[in-house]
Amino acid sequence: MRKTTLPAFISTLVVCYIFWLLITGQIPAVFTGGAAPQILIAGVLVSVLAAAFTARFFIHSKAFHLFNPVRLFTLLFYCIFIFMKELIKANVDVAKRALSPKLPVNPGIVKVPTELKSDYGLSMLSNSITLTPGTITMDVADEDDGTNLYIHWIDVGSEDPKEAGDQIKGTMENWIRRIFE
């Protein structure tokens, strides 16, 4: 079992406390000076307890390499430009298929190889694919031939794993590799 590191504990504590402020509606009051002290103190206590028990599960020490400014800028660029472009393309494609019954729908599950090694990179790629309409990442599997994603695709354009991967992943995998590896 992993030990809880101080940066992981503090990061989890801060995230928990911000979440506490959000769900109790205290964020505006904090800035205007009208926050109820008992709610703020209760939030600190709950956040400390939550961080003490969960920090080792939520934040791995390898995640802190993201504090590199180049990686943070790349992550921001990916989210704003690369992922949004893929998201808009997929939305338009699914909307066309929904509004025009003549367009083919050929659903299926395809095996897509990936060269990503880090859990964070695989998770981000899987979630990026799932968040784009028309695709759902069903499984991430470490197999003899490497790591593969099994993706349900609304319109299977190719059954060849490499070609299907190029169509589904686009440039997302390359950008995610720059961020996490």
Predicted regions and their residues:
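Short, structured loop/turn "capping" segments at alpha-beta junctions
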Residues: N91, A95, K102-P107
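Membrane-proximal, non-transmembrane interface segments of integral membrane proteins
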Residues: K96-L99, V112-T114
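Generic preference for well-ordered secondary structure
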Residues: K3, S61-F64, N68, C79, ...
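Membrane-targeting alpha-helical segments
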Residues: M1-N91
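Terminal membrane-proximal soluble interaction domains of membrane-associated proteins
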Residues: V105-E181
